[in-house]
Amino acid sequence: MHELAVTESLLQVVLQHAGKGGAGKVVSVSVRIGELSDLVNEWMQRYFDYLSRGTIAEGALIRIERIPATFRCDACGDVFPADPRTREAIRCPCCASEAMTLVTGRECFVQQIEVT
């Protein structure tokens, strides 16, 4: 249940930026989350609803966009999508190497804040 801590941090970012802009109300928050983060959308919205009570973000909708996992082959440099949760070994589609570095898939950040 690390959604609570992550959502609390996201709310702080939202309130800080909305406050700087003189917003009266936060309508929605667009968040980009890597598919490997294991954050559950429903719980993030529930925690956001709970934590934002009494703030200008109360009632705001969280819009979550998932970022797919991509890897860079350490041998040839090719960047490709793959699901590391599969039981099969991940291999580079260009050279079949198993040596790779995660490029995307663990991110979590506020992309946009809609205010009135």
Regions found by a protein language model. Name each.
Residues C73-C76, C92-C95:
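Short cysteine-rich clusters marking metal-coordination/redox-active sites
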Residues Q112-T116:
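Short hydrophobic/aromatic patches at helix-to-coil boundaries
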Residues F71, I90, C108:
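Cys/His-enriched microdomains
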Residues D83-T86, L102-G105:
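Short Cys/His-rich "knuckle" micro-motifs
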Residues R66-I67, M100:
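Structured, basic alpha/beta domains of bacterial-type, RNA-associated proteins
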Residues V79-F80, E98-A99:
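Cys/His-rich microdomains that often coordinate metals
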Residues M1-R63:
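Long, charged N-terminal interaction/targeting segments
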Residues M1, G77-V79:
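Intrinsically disordered, low-complexity, mixed-charge
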